[in-house]
Amino acid sequence: MHLHFTPRQIVEKLDQYIIGQKDAKKAVAVALRNRYRRSKLAENLRDEIAPKNILMIGPTGVGKTEVARRMAKLVGAPFIKVEATKFTEVGYVGRDVESMVRDLVETSVRIVKEEMVVKVQDKAEEQANQRLVEILVPSPEKQSGFKNPLEMLFGGAQNSNQTTDSQEDVEIEKKRQDVERKLAAGLLEDEIVSIEVTEQQSSMFDMLQGTGMEQMGMNFQDALGSFMPKKTKKRKLSVKEARKVLTNEEAQRLIDMDEVTQEAVYRAEQLGIIFIDEIDKIAGKQSNSVDVSREGVQRDILPIVEGSNVATKYGSVKTDYILFVAAGAFHMSKPSDLIPELQGRFPIRVELTKLSTDDFVKILIEPDNALIKQYMALLATEGIEIEFSDEAIRKIAEIAYQVNQDTDNIGARRLHTIMEKLLEDLSFEASEITLEKITITPQYVEEKLATIAKNKDVSQFIL
């Protein structure tokens, strides 16, 4: 966990990936820092302080989800994104709202398990190598000493058998030591070995996921695990690949799942972040049965956000200290259309602004994972160096902004569509091009995009 970041440091980290939206960054930075502050309080006071949930308001593609996702990744907190429209009111067929908490715990278990695997990696690899040695130099089958009843009485061939076994053991030990040295030196990496691996089987209960049956809070497959032994199958792999498979199996054996579960539930309860997208779609005044159902979903979400206990296969999970971040465009509705009780549970309101041409320019070049850097890296694998002139980047940004204005505003996602269209021919012919360096100019951008961008009807379908 990295809860020690100051709010300013958190904003600086988010700036590496997200352009603008200072208010949203400040809100999540303060929320994260308050978790650190809360952890330093006396226990009686700590229990009284719950996180202040955040409501983000802004059009699609401006960074609502990315702010929350990067925030969670920054501190290593369990994080899930759910869509409010996927849930149904209790009594209807569909996912119940408690499933979001169960999904959060599953994510937390996966994170903790991965951390534990890293800790036991060296020991697991050592044991995997030992298994490889035994596979490469197998033990001979011991002769049974009970073939002849007379031998049991008089010890007929027992001494000679023991002598033979002893000699074989010495020879095998020498061979294994030799193989062990070769393995350590990496001389046997391409050797093919036959190993037994646990077969991954899909459960028939997977069909029940998403139908409301998961509300029982348990995994049927786990419950029946003791009655349904795991199947194994033989696989022929190179020593290099077999080592990975065996290391993973040994790591799973070395991990204490009780410890994993305990830590995972703690992290989900104290550090978990649930991002509820499209919350505006379940807001609205009651006018028909559909709206009544939407209000029912809001009322079902309310106790989860307020703080309650949710049954999971890992035990009961308290939601009192989970941070909820809700988001929506609110084009057809207003935050005040949410039921008053739910409004009160999201005291921090943040409005994200629409992206300007200047924002698009920055998005294209400034973040660590900037789009232009991605395309340059992809084409570099074909031996082609491409560069974009400043004027070309400005032209791309202007076209993206204009298409957003003329059609649906999908924010920064428009850049993905435009960049794909711009470099479509280049990407197709890259493996056949003999030029080592190509410069993208405003004229090239104009040639590829301007005609489409100016034709509103065409741009609706292509850009």
UniProtKB/Swiss-Prot annotation:
The lineage of its organism: Bacteria, Bacillati, Bacillota, Bacilli, Bacillales. Pfam families: AAA, AAA_2, ClpB_D2-small. It is found in: Cytoplasm. It comes from Bacillus cereus (strain 03BB102). One of its GO terms (cellular component) is HslUV protease complex. This is ATP-dependent protease ATPase subunit HslU. A double ring-shaped homohexamer of HslV is capped on each side by a ring-shaped HslU homohexamer. The assembly of the HslU/HslV complex is dependent on binding of ATP. The keyword Chaperone applies. Belongs to the ClpX chaperone family. HslU subfamily.
